[in-house]
Amino acid sequence: MTGPTRYLSSRDRAAFTPVHAVWEITLACDLKCHHCGSRAGKRRPDELTTEECLDLVRQLARMGTREITLIGGEAYLRRDWLEIIREIREQGMDCTMQSGGLNLTDERIKAAADAGLQALGISIDGLRDVHDRLRGVKGSFDAAFKALDAIKRHGLSSTVNTQITALVIPQLRELMNLFIEAGAKSWQVQLTVAMGRAADNPELLLQPYELLELMPLLAELYEEGADRGFLLQPGNNIGYYGPYESVWRGNGDDRVYWTSCNAGQNTLGIEADGTIKGCPSLSTSKYAGGNIRDLSFEEIWWTTDELNINRGRTSEELWGFCGSCYYADVCKAGCTWTTSVLFGRAGNNPYCHHRALELSKQGLRERITQVEQAPGTPFDHGRFELILENADGTPRAKLPLANNLIQISSPRRKTKRTSARKELVLCRGCYRHVMPGTKICPFCQGNIRALANRYAKNLREAKKAYQRLVELLPPHIETFQ
């Protein structure tokens, strides 16, 4: 592999190799986060033993897993966490970890590095007041940055994760500057989702129309970060198909774009009691495929319906706006986790930039409102209603939770539905993706071929100009390649 081990090859995709596992090794946690989907705090009553954990590591290795990310709760609160790290590395897999950092001491970080841990991510969800409020412990912000400093000193790669709530949007630029100063190399952002304690605090959730503010800001920060050697990475529930998809999805490779939820295709989640899911964030009640105490990992991966939810998924399963969307056959409604916890079923995703843009063009927007509380168990969710209203917030029409097809003047896709992957083309006029064979862009009305030719010509001229500059400069002046 020339890139990070979790990067997928065409062979990985075709073979459904479980490349990346995210493993909650304990539910015990020293924070009290208001947006925690798993409601972490106390350990699960029947967490895997050390030997069961080590055996699962070996099973994952045999199935072709290349990276395991340890999470909690807090992974370091499990007494044998270092032993698990060592076994992962001995089995030839990469080992990374995500933490809130509250009690991630210098000694713990050094021990993890000595055991073979390669990268350590710290979750920081706002500036000091916002972060400490969300994390439920005063001083957690300072502890997180202290951990970042120790990670750097011990030679581990450091990353930061941020849950985007309604509170943090105005703070994102300042946060990025702080992360860069702290030595972090990358920053993953994802939308806070209505699961667990976040479902108890719906005021933290973004409204779908707020993507119109968020997405341009993230695009600006991506470009600013890239200029400073810092990578902003959108999580899998940040999207989809607006004018910025080509900017960040492929980390600079504009041929890369969202191609549907990967849960159970090349990723999986493991709960501390041995429950296996296609994604660590999916609700246990609906998406648990089985437990390694009852079945081998290989059996769970290949034979359970819950792990196969996305392998043969077609656009026939979509509904609402997503059911008639231009990108339905490719996108398949984005993140399964985000949609299933809102409405109790996947397939209609209001957190979509393309969707927000299309509605905005008609003076409309969508808003969610909670109609059913979450029961209070790990990875639980309530139920939300989707309301279509005028862009100024005045009433327009109320959508029921089923059969709420939104008819808009969005460009229509072909009527034939298929699960085969389409290779989309990037319009060089508006930088939105279009279907192969499209002659006139349905979004900007530009001529796709003419725009591509003009772009290629400009690129050739820019390269020639750069080469002339290199030839004219004195030899002692450095140039950037």
Where are these regions (language model features)?
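Accessory C-terminal segments flanking Radical SAM cores
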Residues: 237-359
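Short functional micro-motifs and their immediate structural scaffolds
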Residues: 34, 41, 330, 340, ...
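Cysteine-rich micro-motifs
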Residues: 348-353, 437-446
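Cys/His-coordinated zinc-binding microdomains
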Residues: 37, 326, 353-356, 431, ...
